[in-house]
């Protein structure tokens, strides 16, 4: 589990939902009949919440007011298992509160309650002390700047320098027009309007996009410059060339918090050693999930996997799979299935013959890496899942992040759990949740390890 420190402006998002069918007799304004209300974590706290949804360990650093709103905010963070030891109380300011009034699913007004003054010297020192204390134990840092007073120029630059000194990835979500504030960061995530405002350059062509990203890289020393382009995806530089990672088409209900989702998912992807292109694809998928919901929504790993793997209808997250199954006789097996070969296909065909539905649990890339080492898998989970789903004997594929499929087996309760004959006299994980466990012989002479060794020998020759 990656440990990430999030520093920035903490915002309470308050939503009033209802219907408006008449004007007030007091003034020509609509009257909202409130039907429901809810409070969400916003700003840097929404970034932290997104990271929790993506299975990270999060330390949050920022400031709340000495008020009831601040107390509720801290309780909400703790309920999400977000570490609040870096959150300070400022007696001179209120907790930032943004109230959105929504009628018939359309936002009609937003009311902001906030103080944007810079922090006093004592609070700045205490925030920096916390940052300095945590920097050695965490894997990466996100600076979530909403221009509410927490991340001033000096504090931002000091934190970036400390992160670089300790060789930590540090990403910034910028505000304002002086990007020297974020110089030497690993990556920043401005949107089109923010970058145009900062560079006084209209991003209306490939040439200008490329020029803007070159400025970020050369003038501000941003290691991985990129810009988010709403429905046009994410643009970045690769070996000096402009690359566009297109967005994933999906109906948009609300873009609130989408930027927080992007920086959270980019951070985790890069910490998992994905390429920048793959990280952008992952971030686009996460954003596609949240814009399809109302409010500052979250994206789970399962929802993101569904978006990424939507090219094949057999690849489903567990929740969707459970909704799909009926009264069929279910056979379940699992594995890494790296470099799919004849032995795999034969094994799966024999497993399918035991029942009506064959479900294959597939270890994710991270899971394979933990089990088999940093050089595996050879084939990505997206491609492995697609290849398995393309086999006629396989009815469904579900990817799991854990080291074992115990959660899948417990939820599915298969009629038959199939494992290889090499499990003879060994404990078969999840067998207590299956009606029957079947150990099946592999076809002799076929294995992924043997294929890898043969490739190595051929290459060496």
Curated annotation (Swiss-Prot):
Catalytic function, reaction form: D-glycero-beta-D-manno-heptose 7-phosphate + ATP = D-glycero-beta-D-manno-heptose 1,7-bisphosphate + ADP + H(+); D-glycero-beta-D-manno-heptose 1-phosphate + ATP + H(+) = ADP-D-glycero-beta-D-manno-heptose + diphosphate
**Which residues are catalytic?**
260
**Residue ranges of the region described as Ribokinase:** 1-311
Enzyme class, top EC level, equals: transferase
**What is an annotated GO biological process for this record, any one?**
ADP-L-glycero-beta-D-manno-heptose biosynthetic process
InterPro entries documented for this protein: Bifunc_HldE, Cyt_trans-like, PfkB_dom, RfaE_dom_I, RfaE_dom_II, Ribokinase-like, Rossmann-like_a/b/a_fold
The record's annotation in CDD domains points to:
RfaE_like (cd01172)
Q: A cellular component term (GO) from this record?
A: cytosol
Q: Which GO terms describe its molecular function?
A: ATP binding; heptose 7-phosphate kinase activity; heptose-1-phosphate adenylyltransferase activity; phosphotransferase activity, alcohol group as acceptor
Check the record and name the Gene3D superfamilies matching this protein: 3.40.1190.20, HUPs
Residues given in the record as ATP binding sites: 191-194
Pathway per the UniProt entry: Nucleotide-sugar biosynthesis; ADP-L-glycero-beta-D-manno-heptose biosynthesis; ADP-L-glycero-beta-D-manno-heptose from D-glycero-beta-D-manno-heptose 7-phosphate: step 1/4; Nucleotide-sugar biosynthesis; ADP-L-glycero-beta-D-manno-heptose biosynthesis; ADP-L-glycero-beta-D-manno-heptose from D-glycero-beta-D-manno-heptose 7-phosphate: step 3/4
Q: What is its EC number?
A: 2.7.1.167, 2.7.7.70
Top-rank lineage group of the source organism: Bacteria
- Annotated region described as Cytidylyltransferase, given as residue ranges: 332-461
Q: Which UniProt keywords apply?
A: ATP-binding, Carbohydrate metabolism, Kinase, Multifunctional enzyme, Nucleotide-binding, Nucleotidyltransferase, Transferase
What task does this protein carry out? Catalyzes the ADP transfer from ATP to D-glycero-beta-D-manno-heptose 1-phosphate, yielding ADP-D-glycero-beta-D-manno-heptose.
Family recorded in the similarity comment: In the N-terminal section; belongs to the carbohydrate kinase PfkB family. In the C-terminal section; belongs to the cytidylyltransferase family.
Query: Subunit info?
Result: Homodimer.
What this protein is called in its record is: Bifunctional protein HldE
């Amino acid at each position: 589990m990656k440990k990430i420190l999030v520093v920035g402006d903490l915002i309470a998002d308050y939503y009033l939902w209802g219907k408006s069918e008449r004007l007030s007799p007091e003034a020509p304004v609509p009257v909202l009949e409130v039907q429901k209300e809810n409070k969400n974590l916003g700003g840097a706290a929404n970034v932290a919440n997104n990271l929790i949804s993506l299975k990270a360990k999060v330390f949050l650093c920022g400031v709340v007011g000495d008020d009831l709103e601040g107390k509720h905010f801290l309780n909400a963070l703790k309920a999400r298992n977000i570490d609040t030891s870096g959150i300070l109380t400022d007696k001179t300011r209120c907790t930032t509160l943004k109230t959105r009034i929504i009628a018939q699913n359309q936002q009609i007004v937003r009311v902001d309650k906030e103080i944007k003054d810079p922090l006093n010297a004592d609070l700045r020192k205490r925030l920096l002390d916390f940052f300095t204390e945590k920097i050695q134990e965490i894997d990466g840092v996100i600076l979530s700047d909403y221009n509410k007073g927490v991340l001033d120029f000096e504090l931002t630059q000091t934190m970036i320098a400390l992160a670089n000194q300790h060789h930590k990835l540090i990403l910034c979500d910028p505000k304002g027009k002086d990007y020297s504030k974020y110089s030497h960061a690993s990556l920043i995530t401005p949107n089109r309007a923010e970058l145009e405002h900062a560079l006084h350059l209209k991003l209306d062509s490939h040439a200008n996009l490329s020029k803007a990203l070159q400025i970020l890289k050369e003038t501000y020393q941003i290691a991985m410059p990129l810009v988010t382009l709403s429905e046009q995806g994410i643009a970045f530089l690769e070996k000096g060339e402009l690359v566009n990672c297109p967005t994933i088409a999906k109906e948009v209900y609300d873009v609130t918090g989408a930027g927080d989702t992007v920086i959270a998912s980019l951070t985790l992807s890069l910490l998992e050693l994905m390429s920048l292109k793959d990280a952008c694809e992952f971030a686009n998928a996460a954003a596609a999930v949240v814009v399809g919901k109302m409010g500052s929504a979250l994206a789970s790993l399962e929802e993101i996997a569904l978006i990424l793997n939507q090219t094949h209808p057999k690849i489903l997250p567990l929740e969707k799979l459970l909704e799909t199954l009926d009264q069929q006789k279910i056979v379940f097996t699992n594995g890494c299935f790296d470099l799919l070969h004849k032995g795999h296909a034969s094994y799966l065909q024999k497993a399918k013959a035991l029942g009506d539905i064959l479900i294959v649990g597939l270890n994710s890339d991270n899971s394979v890496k933990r089990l088999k080492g940093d050089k595996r898998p050879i084939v990505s989970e997206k491609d492995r899942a697609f290849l398995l789903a393309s086999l006629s004997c396989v009815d469904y594929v579900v990817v799991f992040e854990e080291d074992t499929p115990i959660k899948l087996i417990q939820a599915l309760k298969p009629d038959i759990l199939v494992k290889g004959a090499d499990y003879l006299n060994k404990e078969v994980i999840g067998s207590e949740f299956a009606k029957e466990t079947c150990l099946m012989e592999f076809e002799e002479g076929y294995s992924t390890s043997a294929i890898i060794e043969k490739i190595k020998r051929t290459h060496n020759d």
